[in-house]
Amino acid sequence: MTEHEQKYAVRVTPSDKIRFRCTLCGACCRNVKETVPVDCKDAFYLTKHLRDLGMDIYCVDQLLEQYAEPALLDECGFFVYFLKSVGEDNACIFLKDNRCSVQEAKPLACRLYPFMVDPNGSGSFSYLYSTERTHHFRGAVVETRSWMKKHFSQESRAFMQAEYTQAGPIAALLMRIPEHRKTEAVLHFHRLRYSELDLDKPFLEQYQRNQMKLLAILSRMAEEG
């Protein structure tokens, strides 16, 4: 969860209910500079979606170059991507005519809105919702559990737990790698988390395999010094 999300987050239980109605105002797609994360799973499905629509995009690296921007999460070299924002109102780059142009493949953060999830380390999740845009909280009653069942897939759950479990070890290894090899390590990080994803094969299997490769490479580099 980003610092921006934490600022407006209110914790809820699976059985809690809130009022929520999408008004198609586009407000949640504006003023989003560096607030919409695009993890490797999001990037995989966005790339596949745009390719299948006939756009000239055939790999995750192309998507990231055109539609996302990197942000350093830690000085060790661990970085993430956020969707680019455009215009004076810092609107999401995929907002067209006040509508999401990638609705079928939008990032998990957008899919879960107004809710958010936070892995708790025990294999389950804590749930929160964002109070940032108060005019959204009217209309029909929405139960947390039902919303998650609809929008938080088993694949997303498995991926998020793996990210939570492995981020620490990866960051620790990056910290141990000497400065003169840091660029090499970061290139491996990007290659195995983003570049080496085949759009025509299942995501999760590739992700898990690549993560193991990355941990092995970084571990060897840390030992070699």
PLM regions: where:
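Short loop/turn segments that flank or connect secondary-structure elements
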Residues: 1-225
